[in-house]
Curated annotation (Swiss-Prot):
This is DNA-directed RNA polymerase II subunit RPB2. The modification Phosphoserine is found at residue 937. Mg(2+) binds at residue 792. Its EC number is 2.7.7.6, 3.1.13.-, 2.7.7.48. DNA template strand binds at residues 456, 1078, 1085.
Amino acid sequence: MYDADEDMQYDEDDDEITPDLWQEACWIVISSYFDEKGLVRQQLDSFDEFIQMSVQRIVEDAPPIDLQAEAQHASGEVEEPPRYLLKFEQIYLSKPTHWERDGAPSPMMPNEARLRNLTYSAPLYVDITKTVIKEGEEQLQTQHQKTFIGKIPIMLRSTYCLLNGLTDRDLCELNECPLDPGGYFIINGSEKVLIAQEKMATNTVYVFAKKDSKYAYTGECRSCLENSSRPTSTIWVSMLARGGQGAKKSAIGQRIVATLPYIKQEVPIIIVFRALGFVSDRDILEHIIYDFEDPEMMEMVKPSLDEAFVIQEQNVALNFIGSRGAKPGVTKEKRIKYAKEVLQKEMLPHVGVSDFCETKKAYFLGYMVHRLLLAALGRRELDDRDHYGNKRLDLAGPLLAFLFRGMFKNLLKEVRIYAQKFIDRGKDFNLELAIKTRIISDGLKYSLATGNWGDQKKAHQARAGVSQVLNRLTFASTLSHLRRLNSPIGRDGKLAKPRQLHNTLWGMVCPAETPEGHAVGLVKNLALMAYISVGSQPSPILEFLEEWSMENLEEISPAAIADATKIFVNGCWVGIHKDPEQLMNTLRKLRRQMDIIVSEVSMIRDIREREIRIYTDAGRICRPLLIVEKQKLLLKKRHIDQLKEREYNNYSWQDLVASGVVEYIDTLEEETVMLAMTPDDLQEKEVAYCSTYTHCEIHPSMILGVCASIIPFPDHNQSPRNTYQSAMGKQAMGVYITNFHVRMDTLAHVLYYPQKPLVTTRSMEYLRFRELPAGINSIVAIASYTGYNQEDSVIMNRSAVDRGFFRSVFYRSYKEQESKKGFDQEEVFEKPTRETCQGMRHAIYEKLDDDGLIAPGVRVSGDDVIIGKTVTLPENEDELESTNRRYTKRDCSTFLRTSETGIVDQVMVTLNQEGYKFCKIRVRSVRIPQIGDKFASRHGQKGTCGIQYRQEDMPFTCEGITPDIIINPHAIPSRMTIGHLIECLQGKVSANKGEIGDATPFNDAVNVQKISNLLSDYGYHLRGNEVLYNGFTGRKITSQIFIGPTYYQRLKHMVDDKIHSRARGPIQILNRQPMEGRSRDGGLRFGEMERDCQIAHGAAQFLRERLFEASDPYQVHVCNLCGIMAIANTRTHTYECRGCRNKTQISLVRMPYACKLLFQELMSMSIAPRMMSV
């Protein structure tokens, strides 16, 4: 890589990076990371892995379809019918394509898919080999090449997307935003993102203590074959509690039992060993207790040995297990066969499912028991369910693979059924017709569209909310949504443990960004530099270990295990090694050279427990760290210099990893490294804190996620405030994407004059917050002025608002399509006329053009018609003279929302997937800040606008500066958002200095004292206070006031969208009470608590009015004799109660309609409520 003379320029000492140099150097390293990876790389890589590896693997793993007709006994001699074998082989994926109605394929661009409500998917083809075997003839092989089997939705910006690798200019020509990160799908025109799902890691042994159950301790192993369709099979090894109901009068002591898959009862552990073929006690103990010099442990196993004393042979043990199976066999042979199957295929499948894996399984089972005993003896800590090393994240790849596997299985089933029909009739079948392509296409589309992850027919078992509509409110909310993690624990559970911030989340998951309320701590977000492993094959590592003198389990004597180190690969025990130190060094060296071992593999050496664990599986969360050797960074100046020139010399992050100065460390391995926070810690001091550092953080601010990285000085705020801002930053208005004018989003807010903040963090440049900001630098004073800013409200400058301060535009799209309901009902876009059209509302239809659509530029207000559409009324058979019907059509137009007004911005007419006419109309309205709108600073300080004063009524400084916003001093002390104040100071300095201020967290170079000194250099008060003059009187305000520029955001909650009142309006059909909700012009509920207040006041008439007259007044006629509602004909004034034959003694009772309904419903249940009139 370097020439000899190039090396000469750097001396050994010269090349070291000093702490001062590091202030800038670390950001060069971080920039190179983001240049290469971007922010959604984990989504894209996972999807690419699915397309390139998983699909092919799933197709190859499927067994060939073997078909044969029933033998025909027609002509005396039995002729063996031909056998057909179908094998699916190589797969091919084409570019995303769309077939028009005329059948011509054309490449589909993502924006076209969004606008026309199509699915952005690519066709999948497969080679099928069909073999015909006839008796006495040689085999006939036919190749069906590239048979279409379905469409797979494509993730935007992944390798197979049409946008992959295009320049910014090309993207703009395709109406795509160059800043859009991709990482989502387009299904029926809406953008869907797959949320990473958390799960416990498979194939690892966990030991937990059990509370209040018959077991004291339980060891479990969720065992699952890599890349197989089998569901995980879990095996539990448990130790019974002392003197519990399980221990037989506790004479025997604590027994150990195993719970096997498909076996109903628990089986004593020793019997399982005997069933595996280890009969003598010594053999079994050797596999459990490696060291016989351990009396305590021997004592623990003794009760289990005594219990299984009765059963001494393998077959007896197998019979014992088989007879407890799900459906026990009739004969002994069948039972034994069943037990053998369970032990071979279902117990610990990851160790092996082929024959002769008994030794390995016995060792693994023994290891599980050993772990259980260690925990029971208190020699090893129990496992932690919430440790992030024990968790795996299922991203798009594994999630889609799970779905595709199920769909493909169904496809094969259908092919088999179809082909068998033809073969039974003695005909050949057509493969193209046998393959139902809709199974895969619709199956994947259904799950991505609804978020129910699984088969459509079993929707109730499926996980909900795996796929969500991508949040497009602000650019930051989009990025954050693409990096979200979800724990599938019931939201209603009151468990605090899984919700708490675990130590192992440091650097992997953002500590601040999590929703408030019932999902707190269950929904998390990735930290900025965290990456999720894609998974790689363990085979090269296994081969390497074989060469490097690892002893295989089958070849060793059990006695050797006690002193050696066990080696696990992906949770499976593969062997032992005598020299772990050297092995680990070699493995690490290989990983750093990226030779044999991929950089995302993690290697953990647990010295205390004498174990080496190697993980290559997918879904481990890891992050890059700098490698330290001999207390010096391996990263040198020359690397930094090359990175600075990376645009010209192609030296990138990948080269940095390849040259072995950075490596990826996952959560488990992080616990075995010694981490320096800054290179400053590596300096030799008099009192060294530690002299064995192995790694160093790149920059501590990288522990934060997307939304928390926007906060200036988050290390000066009380922690919940950062959490609040992380949630509010997702609701701020800005420019959410640069191509918003060509998109037809259902809802969109765009700020008129967004500004980049004066005070920024260094992380912001990777979030593109400077290019797509969401807020304005406002002059903010902290004062109580006229008292219109109490309780978190703010006073705004009316004149600034008139000049465009925080003005925004709001877009809403309406869509409608013509579709054919039946053969005689068809929908048409047209302008309905009152002569021929039934059911027209009292609305203005005049604004429509003749084609039924409104023209752009027309001003519309609530309940105006935007899209005119009619549907033909079906002709009734009984009408003979149907020619002179008055109405032939029914109106089913689309109206503007009642509470909105605006101007039609854009009208789009096109054809949708079925070839029907389809239109989208976008209406825009200008939103000017007004009293009641919500604003917030970047520190969780939210407030609504309390009043707006003209500029001349606002206070002013001697320089003539008036604040845009005045907030109340009471907002600061109890909330301790000191970052807010420092930001204001820093902003003041920046405005004077003319350069952007740095507010990156954990940065010792910036502190309040330094900022204050700079401020006083510019002739201001040290702490930012100024003398203000009252705007009403012009007099000096007695106290000095803190004033300066602070970045404020306008949030999406606006008073226009929420204002609601009702006098009269629609009522519900069932109980005749007012409807609910603003959109339906509903009433306001007078609830139980309000009722109680009125009772306490004794306001009886008011109570009657609210709960009766203003709600659902009704009157019924009641028979005075039996108290049940009577028949009343109010026109003829005749009343009767048939049961009592009473026509005279009837009273009129007024009651709420809901009460009458309740009485009648009770009557339908044979309960007769009688209303006796007094």
